[in-house]
Swiss-Prot record:
This is Lysozyme C. It comes from Tragopan satyra (Satyr tragopan). It comes from the Eukaryota. It is found in: Secreted. PROSITE patterns: GLYCOSYL_HYDROL_F22_1, GLYCOSYL_HYDROL_F22_2. Disulfide bonds join 6-127, 30-115, 64-80, 76-94.
Length: 129
């Protein structure tokens, strides 16, 4: 599923991401835009053999199990396929675990490079939330 901007913002808000660990909703919508272009089915293979999955491009080396990543830790205790669902609950729950680690949203390269320090509120402007 490819979410609309405001549709995704509403879903993320409903699932408790607004101001989760101090990151406003705009940060999450911005991250999803530049990680997956709002597409829940996005997958990207990395040079280390791991794969990033779903709307927030969650990595199989650490967070989920895809059965093909050597030394996978599966810290969210989920199959990576769960991160490709049109229902973003699994992705959001895993993202909460990731952002609670030491580096916060810096764990997402696209957020660090494209969203951090920008006017992220623009991503939810005009949405009925």
């Amino acid at each position: 599923k490819v979410y609309g901007r405001c549709e995704l913002a509403a879903a993320m808000k409903r699932l408790g991401l607004d101001n989760y660990r101090g990151y406003s909703l705009g940060n999450w919508v911005c991250a999803a835009k530049f990680e997956s272009n709002f597409n829940t089915h996005a997958t990207n293979r990395n040079t280390d053999g791991s794969t990033d999955y779903g709307i927030l491009q969650i990595n199989s080396r650490w967070w989920c199990n895809d059965g093909r990543t050597p030394g996978s830790r599966n810290l969210c205790n989920i199959p990576c396929s769960a991160l490709l669902s049109s229902d973003i609950t699994a992705s959001v729950n895993c993202a909460k675990k990731i952002v609670s680690g030491g580096s916060g949203m810096n764990a997402w390269v696209a957020w660090r490079n494209r969203c951090k320090g920008t006017d992220v509120q623009a991503w939810i402007r005009g949405c009925r939330l």
